Amino acid sequence: MTTTARLFRPLAIPALAALALIVLALAAPARAESVTPLVSSAWLKQHLGDPDVFVLDVRSAIDGGGAEAFLKGHVPGAIHSDYDKAGWRVTRGGVPFMLPTLPELEKLIGELGIDEDTHVVVVPAGVHFTDFGSAARTYWTLKVAGVAKVSILDGGHAAWVAEKNQTESGASKPSPKIFSATLNNALLAEAGEVQKIEQSGGATLIDARPASFFAGKQKAPAAKAYGHIPGAVNADSATFYDAQTNRLKPQAELAAIAATLPGGPAVAYCNTGHWAATDWFVLSELLGRKDVRLYYGSMVEWTSDASRPLASARTKWDDLKKTLGFGS
């Protein structure tokens, strides 16, 4: 063996080890980045066999579906959890559609077969902007509970079928896991915090309802009064959605819409935290805006206390039309 060979041979193993560490370090971020807020049907088809990928079908009466629609056909291996009935929103303190408690979240999520390491792909029906809100609210709830890897199937079940992907019928039985929830307070806003914002500022209140609700011409049945939280700006969740494709609009269009809103911290709300979940999802998850939260109690909780202020363009004529049966 030459002197040169003797000098370099012992370095071969450490050098390879160092190279391996570099490769692993570079690969780790790439793997983390692969979990995107929206995934395509092609991506889901490719990853259906992955042990950590969990397909969560949330179709409900909101989209004209539910358990019956799931039984007729769903993404292979999917587990159904009715957004409207399973407990994703609960009544607390007499106020409906609220975020479940931590123990309730642990039970709901764990019994489905989801834990902290699961990559959940939420599948809505894919038929309407309100239906997308079901997926966005479920996505937000999972994130709030501490599930780090969550995505929504772009276009939902309708897109999966339209792209001629395989479906299966019948019931799917979950395999429960132990799930320990860790509440992510950075994603949510409570009524007290919103009241401080209304009084003193510090964040933009974004009302995700249609303009007629914002103006006080309409209200949700569960809300006690008309109008909006004073100082809020209106950003109807439907403006982010393309009704022709039943998907969110392209990224550039979403960014253009979002650019019309004030910058800085923001809190989205609507009637029940459903439409507002779409605004939150677009701003926070797709556009990467920092410090965007969801006031899940929204107008139903806000108006449950008559002392909380409201702004409204409602007139006596609007009230008269309602009395006569011509208005809301």
Q: What are the functions of these language-model segments?
A:
Residues E33-S34, L38, Q46, R89, ...:
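Active-site neighborhoods of enzymes that stabilize oxyanions during catalysis
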